[in-house]
UniProtKB/Swiss-Prot annotation:
Gene Ontology terms: biological process: L-cysteine catabolic process to pyruvate
Protein name stated in the entry: UPF0597 protein HRM2_02820
One Pfam match: SDH_alpha
InterPro entries associated with the record: Ser_deHydtase-like_asu, UPF0597
Lineage: Bacteria, Pseudomonadati, Thermodesulfobacteriota, Desulfobacteria, Desulfobacterales
Molecular-function GO terms, alphabetical: L-cysteine desulfhydrase activity
Family: Belongs to the UPF0597 family.
Amino acid sequence: MNYTIKDILKLEVAPALGCTEPTAIALGAAAAATLLFPGKAIETIEVWLDPNLFKNGLAVSIPRTHGRSGLDLAAALGALAGDAHLKMEVLTPITDKDVDAALALVAGKQVKVRLLDRHRGLLVRTRIKAGDQIAESVIEQLHDNITSLCLNGEQIETTDLFPRSLEGGKNQTSALELWLRGITMETMIAMIDDLDGSDLEFLQTGIDMNMALARHGLENAVGLGVGTTLEALAQKGLVARDMIHRARVLTAAAADARMSGAPLPAMSSAGSGNHGLTAILPVKAVADHLKSDRKDLCRAVGLSHVVTAFVKAHTGRLAAICACSVAAGAGATAAITWLLGGTPGQIGGAVENIIEDLAGVICDGAKNSCALKLDTAAARAVQAALFAMNGLTVKVTDGIVGGSAEETIRNMGILSSQGMIETDKTILKIMMDKLINSRSEQ
């Protein structure tokens, strides 16, 4: 089966409120809670997580909680007041009263989160006990892919919470990723010619959504404050106000806002809100600098989403490698090079530039300092494009660089999925040791 760019946008690009890892935990709990009798008091919540989801959700702020974080809090919020039908916007209905109730569950040690340290691949398994009822849910492979619901041990066969599937029962996104791994850069570039009016409107909505986060970050000085600091440095004349600076400011400020738990959705890309910020905002900054028209901006962002999905199909959904840098960064690079008038060869060369530059950036979980990495990715995306447009591209003799952009991306996928397994374990161990030490000091 061949896919269109409309299919890719439908499956890979969607609004997400808050970091996608605690949101996935909340979604799993909310889905299980739909099986309980209304008004039934929750006694216990148990959640089992894969290592990468555990790592990514450990320290990031949860929307509508006034800056609070915690895997257990995310589960409690989802179970008590989340709307599972909203998928990655599951926490939209949360109120201060719900937060207080969730905190009470956590304080009463009624929520247990366990690490499945040997599991590979995304997994959220949730069990909620309420009186004589036990409700269970499973999310696998993708953050919103609910694959199982059980009540008192009996499998629920039909529900609108289950994803639609293709023939043979294969999940649509899994099938798409398999297809993506076999296409070329030329195919991806050609896809944007098929964007219709509704696609362009959807892409513009994503641009507007992520720009709102950037404005929130700049106006409220939230999170680590990377965006506001970059802006202050420019005001002092210490750094230049060019399109690289603008790309950095917009992307970092949006990350500041999102990682601090701002109550605003991000338009995600390939399953991640931060990917969406990186895939969209540097492109917007360059388009503004070039005075590109709205249609070209939206077409470029469409290309960015496709390339981001292509890279993620090789690296996997969650890994030790920072995919904001190499996947969404590659998407933004391709889009920027296209806006600059680049040929398919120059676009591929630019993508290879950024991958060779940032392939070693690790993911040490979602948290405020992600803004630093998104700042770097935005800057390098513009630089990689400008380098390629001026004849500078890395060579096949260099490290993991292959004979084409596609081969280089495949090599990076091998690095991510095979070469960084122990790195991932070490990162998580350091984070867990910190958590244990901080608790022992309290």
